[in-house]
Regions:
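Substrate-binding groove of N-acetylhexosamine-processing glycoside hydrolases
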Residues: 1-154, 158, 177
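Short, compositionally stereotyped local motifs that mark structural "simplifiers"
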Residues: 143-213
């Protein structure tokens, strides 16, 4: 764990702030998956041990509280990596089992993120700061929104074949209509509904969108 002296540093955490739905296959090789799993397990073990020690001490409580927050934040960061891996796998192979697992993992992550936010706000207030708290709490809210909106994200994939390009549109959970346009305009519920991959033979701008219930 890194010794972090203020709550400001505790939210400047790269893993939590990286985009959830920007997928790069190299992130999901077996070595990275295994390393993140170990990272998650060890950070949670440290977190539990710190909680136990915190309940037994009578001095230096603020130091333990900062360490607990840091350990839990590290754990939640590893949870986000795991969720991202799972969402990517579901996008590539949208079976009922994978979709159900991704939705369950999303709920678990949101619960943990909510607890992390509460711990962060408590630590911030303990420092008696009256400024910028909303700036950092909004980052937590954005992370949660990205998870909640994951099902509406449309992934546009293209395959070049001779003189034409085939366009495929996908969502992670494959459970709602996809609306699209090929003239660069923003799609709405009156736009074309995607049913199967389609070919384009000239330069155009494809835009697609889903709309939640």
């Amino acid at each position: 764990l890194i010794d972090e002296s203020s709550t400001t540093n505790l939210m400047n955490f790269t893993v939590l702030n990286t985009p959830l739905l920007e997928f790069y296959p190299s992130e999901f090789d077996s070595a990275n998956v295994a390393l993140n799993k170990e990272y998650k397990e060890k950070s949670f073990e440290i977190y539990k041990n710190l909680l136990k020690d915190r309940s037994e001490i009578t001095t230096n409580a603020e130091i333990f509280d900062a360490a607990i927050l840091s350990a839990y934040r590290t754990y939640v960061g590893a949870m986000k990596n795991e969720l991202k891996q799972n969402l990517y796998n579901t996008l590539q192979n949208p079976t009922e089992e994978n979709i159900a697992a991704s939705k369950q993992m999303s709920e678990q992550f949101l619960d943990s993120l909510h607890l992390l936010k509460k711990r962060f706000v408590k630590a911030w207030d303990m420092e008696s700061r009256s400024y910028y708290r909303n700036v950092f709490t909004e980052r937590y809210d954005k992370i949660a929104k990205d998870v909640l909106d994951a099902g509406n994200k449309v992934f546009i994939q293209t395959t070049d074949n001779r003189q034409q390009t085939t366009v495929s549109l996908k969502t992670i959970f494959n459970d709602r209509p996809i609306y699209y346009t090929v003239d660069g305009s923003e799609p709405d519920k009156n736009s074309m509904v995607y049913t199967e991959p389609f070919a384009i033979e000239r330069s155009c701008v494809v835009k697609a969108a889903c709309y939640g219930d």
